[in-house]
Amino acid sequence: YEKPSFYGNLKVIGYKPNNSEEETHYILYQNGFTQNTVAKNGESLNTYIHVLNNLSMSSEIGNALVLGFGAGALPNYLESKKYNVDVVEIDPLTLSIATEYFNYKKKKSNIFFEDARTFIKKCKKKYDLIVIDLFFGDGVPEHLTTKEFYRDVKKCMVKDGILLNNTVVDLDKVETLDFVLSTFRSEFKNIYYFFDKEL
């Protein structure tokens, strides 16, 4: 499956692992870059999703905000753990793709099709957990990496809320990591980061 959208080219490829008779896995690409790999049952095969899943359980069960829908694996997971989930996604086409190929089964999630920056700016609700998983191709749009953006994100969180952020950093360029961390530190006291060198 391949279809252009206003926000880039979306492509889904199915494959059987190790040329076996196992169930088909599906990969979601945006503008040629992998966004997620999901088994037929909807379980993500990407390491970072499992890290986010485990870390999210440190939060009180309550309201969760997911910025970036992708293949729908994370919203699916959070719903299964009884979170009240709001999802912000700029590209409406991702929902139909996630439903058809990635076993996304919307139950109670509220999905808002708009730019994450705009949503955060006008946000009135307080969230126990916010997950930022925003990519355009192989990078994050610049307006979603600023101190101002994270200041507004913080305003959408309860006092002891948790923010999980998935981002791509070139580990060969120390200054890039320093920039990302200094941006987080401008608004948040306790920061933990994990690397997945396979990505």
Enumerate the predicted regions with their spans:
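A short acidic, Gly/Pro-enriched loop at the edge of an enzyme's catalytic core
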Residues: 121-131
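Conserved beta-strand signature within the Rossmann-like core of class I S-adenosyl-L-methionine
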Residues: 160-167
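Glycine/threonine-rich flexible loop motifs
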Residues: 138-145
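Class I S-adenosyl-L-methionine
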Residues: 2-3, 171, 175-199
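A short glycine-rich, Lys/Arg-flanked "PGG" loop and its adjoining helix->strand segment in the class I
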Residues: 145-159
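Conserved SAM-binding strand-loop segment of SAM-dependent methyltransferases
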Residues: 104-116
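Short beta->alpha hinge that forms the Motif I/post-I loop of the SAM-binding pocket
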Residues: 89-92, 114-116, 145, 176
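Class I S-adenosylmethionine
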Residues: 1-88, 92-102
